[in-house]
Design a protein with these regions (language model features):
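An N-terminal alpha-helical hairpin/helix-loop-helix interaction module that forms a charged
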Residues: 1-58, 75-153
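Short hydrophobic alpha-helical segments that form membrane-spanning helices or hydrophobic packing faces
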Residues: 65-71
Length: 153
């Protein structure tokens, strides 16, 4: 069982460049949480529980990785968070006022999922999956961040 979790952690770490150095410790941490029921139920607090880990005596918070791990298992229940998606949700909040939220709310997974769902509702994207919306926001966010970087130079 640990080997299966470790493979998933390694794949996600490579695929999404999550920069987790202690992959074995993260896999063991996930296994120790006994997550199956919580994944099945879409338990938002699971993201926080996976994200919080102590590595080499230091407290780490792998939030983006934790959202991706949960989304890999239950893509209909867990939208992915990363900096590009967060950037675009903040951008659309400013441009359209689709939802009221503090930036810090994006790092509270229950709040984040509510914000994400509000974005989907506001823009009538109900026919699209979380994964499809994530792909759109990620690509747009990456371009947006690159453009901002060019303007700052």
């Amino acid at each position: 069982m640990l080997e299966e979790v470790l493979i998933k952690v390694l794949v996600l770490n490579d695929l999404y460049s999550t920069n987790i150095l202690g992959t074995y410790a993260v896999a063991k941490h996930i296994l120790d949480l006994h997550i199956d029921e919580r994944l099945k139920n879409g338990d938002a607090s699971l993201v926080t529980d996976i994200a919080h880990i102590e590595l080499n005596g230091k407290e780490k918070y792998f939030y983006s990785f934790a959202t991706k791990y949960c989304a890999m298992h239950q893509p209909k229940l867990f939208p992915i968070y990363d900096r590009f998606v967060g950037e675009m949700l903040r951008y659309f909040r400013k441009q359209t006022h689709f939802a009221r939220f503090a930036n810090a709310d994006l790092k509270n997974y229950a709040e984040y999922r509510t914000i994400y769902d509000a974005f989907i509702q506001f823009f009538a994207l109900n026919d699209f999956t979380y994964k499809q919306v994530d792909n759109y926001l990620w690509k747009l966010g990456k371009e947006h961040v690159q453009e901002k970087g060019k303007k700052e130079k």
